[in-house]
């Protein structure tokens, strides 16, 4: 009898353990299912060409995929399906812009992509998106459009990052894909020589073209990686812009998507890893800081100025609550009648569109050249005009006027006497008139001549860090904490 009771109890225990194990195995699946249900709010059809999956409890990142009905259509669909699930799991809202190629020109394609990015930014508050974290991605010809939008779109329609998969960059492959209609080749002074191998890459702009991740296959016989993706990476790296390059030994133009091979799996892992590790700088709550200036702001002579120039170091010093942007352009003057006026530059238009809360305006070094200073009667007027334009922005920024650092050598006819005795008094006068604060770099940087490059005009990376230190200390506490 005792043996029977023991057997019955053992069966009960085994049954209980079986149920327990089964329930434990179901819990993770149930939890994952609930997580997916919580993440996706709904699938939204925005118009006949645009639809998206909006993610609840998202960090605000969104990606727009550009898809076209050409010979790559099957590969595009496979790539989107492979990435869509992982994007949603990361809390990324995902949009797809579908369009036809027949009868279209590239201007129409880029315009529609720009309008889509602007739509997402305009709808950011109601769709719970971060307007400063909108990316664009494209495969093949879609990569061409994504790259062009990244390089040439106005600030409000330009993405914050791009994902380019075996992108068409060269004119040669554009012709092969029948897309060269209505395209004007870039001028001969572009970043790359104007042969057809570097067509889109020649439009890359220092500090202004957003960071990119390029995914290429070495055995792509449809789009030659050297003339296309590698050319774009070379232009980005040559301009000191942030860019990542992934090259797979095999996979073909479709990355093995059609065969479901190892390249496809590695590609998905690399895309997810890049997105997870991408540093987010700006949010709608960030204090936006615009650094406006010439080559000293730009970081001329400093390799990877996007990381080592003074604006980048200033970003690190100020911290996460700030979004510091470099709008420096080499050789530019404050004088509108100078040889290269800053106000004619895309960087000036971008700085205004950035709508900063704080501006560090540092111009005047190139104005001291005799060929420019002969127009000195316009310096005060032109500086007042710049300050007035900045202060009239919707954010009503606090404008700091930084004096030029000393010219330790008279390289390129730059005259430190003119800077100290003529330009700086005008800067101080304008500061009093417009209630701006002065950052006296000329005085405070004077002891650091050893932190200059051989030309005596441009700081080294260490000198740029010292500039950032001086500027950070001079930003008033109320401006830093507002």
Please provide the spans of the model-predicted regions:
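C-terminal catalytic histidine-bearing segment of alpha/beta-hydrolase fold enzymes
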Residues: 53, 230-282, 454-455, 461, ...
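Primarily recognizes the serine-hydrolase "nucleophile elbow" in alpha/beta-hydrolase
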Residues: 115-179, 196
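Active-site segments of SGNH/GDSL-like serine hydrolases
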Residues: 362-366, 389-421
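N-terminal cap/lid segment of alpha/beta-hydrolase-fold proteins
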Residues: 32-60
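Conserved SGNH/GDSL esterase-like catalytic core that processes O-acyl groups on lipids
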Residues: 286-290, 296-384, 418-421
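Catalytic His-Asp segment of secreted/periplasmic serine-dependent ester chemistry enzymes
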Residues: 252-258, 302, 405-482
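Catalytic nucleophile-loop/oxyanion-hole region of alpha/beta-hydrolase
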Residues: 75-77, 83, 96-131, 257-265
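The feature captures the conserved acid-bearing segment of alpha/beta-hydrolase catalytic domains
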Residues: 161, 169-176, 191-230
